[in-house]
């Protein structure tokens, strides 16, 4: 840091500087503007991490790599142009840049690492040039305002066929990232797989139709879609179904509910379901109550994680496997109602600070001591 200074909110980076080192301006909350000289070829890891007042940065065409977490948490940054000289955008490079409304990824960029633009909640559209041949996991996760995704024609690895507002891995027909809008999405019938977190936190999304050719859905593919009120799996799908109009995706062979909705509430879980899968209702923020039927024997980790409006849970006697974090961060829970002979059992499977919530069916709402 001795090499650089900040004057009147502007980072002073001398001509002739070859790189901006790791952590160079880490946490400099007074920094508002960065002008990088053309001698710089690399922006180091966490170079501008936590520069929460940074509103403007000009990245010259000399830069070849933007390091991991380079602009992490730069929550005042509104636009950025990635020049054609940049080959790699590092992991979490612009993660948490919540005011970022415009990103230009120039032809020449080859790799966008995992979570590079995660949580850019003001971003509305993305254009992926044909030079980009590697996109990491959850690159645009948490981009809740995203309404348009386009992959340039001629990209050898990815496409956005049928104007689907999504990024699809061409060779595998895997949908790796979708949009919040239009609110009712159309997944192309040629898609066979939906990647983990593909629609995570698409908060405007209200309905989903899963074509019969989709035979693989990654964990938390629709987590945090808190406006989602309708999920339908096309008849004839060999792996999944939405039996009994349940507004959920069920793995047919195992009777495992892998994705549910926030609404209607209370939700109705079919009596044929035997397991609530990992993260099945994670981020269903509008869900207020749930009844777990007698058929359910297993509730997996984070099944109801972060259901912040959930108040009442009815658990049956049949649950023999309950992960301790199944209802983690359900901050408004008022009662977990269980059969009389199961009170002690459930207290063994919930964290100590939730024991006061566990009451017999038919009892008054508990009061925390």
Predicted regions and their residues:
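Structural signature of tandem-repeat unit edges
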Residues: 1-19, 29-42, 52-65, 75-88, ...
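Surface-exposed repetitive/solenoidal architectures
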Residues: 24-26, 282, 349-352
